[in-house]
């Protein structure tokens, strides 16, 4: 994978580079390292690399989904109501679309994300 140093691209361009990087990592880089570790008798290290491959593959899947949302113009919209949370102040609202700005702290829509309730 290549990462153009010093360049800040568009969200679309950055996601495309990230997708390419993750793909390279799980299809070539880590499998090569796992094979080498296995060949040299380091089974635990090879197993760790195989588990990292699973994580990298998931990263690619997530970035592909994000790119799809960005390209469709529906990054801050869903077909059904969900909870949106402001990453700045924590304000939560249930809606199909994130607010244009946070009614609590006045930060723009870009500070909202689907709320994670994983505790």
Residue ranges: model-predicted function:
Residues 1-119:
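Non-heme di-metal
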């Amino acid at each position: 994978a290549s990462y153009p140093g010093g360049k800040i691209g568009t969200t679309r361009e950055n996601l495309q580079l990230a997708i390419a990087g993750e793909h390279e990592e799980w299809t070539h880089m880590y499998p090569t390292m796992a094979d080498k570790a296995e060949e040299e008798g380091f089974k635990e290290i090879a197993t760790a690399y195989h588990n990292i491959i699973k994580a990298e593959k998931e990263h690619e899947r997530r970035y592909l989904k994000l790119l799809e949302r960005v390209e469709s113009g529906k990054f801050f919209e869903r077909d059904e109501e969900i909870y949106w949370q402001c990453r700045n102040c924590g304000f939560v609202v249930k809606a199909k679309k994130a607010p244009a700005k946070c009614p609590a702290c006045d930060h723009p829509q870009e500070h909202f994300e689907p709320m994670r309730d994983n505790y």
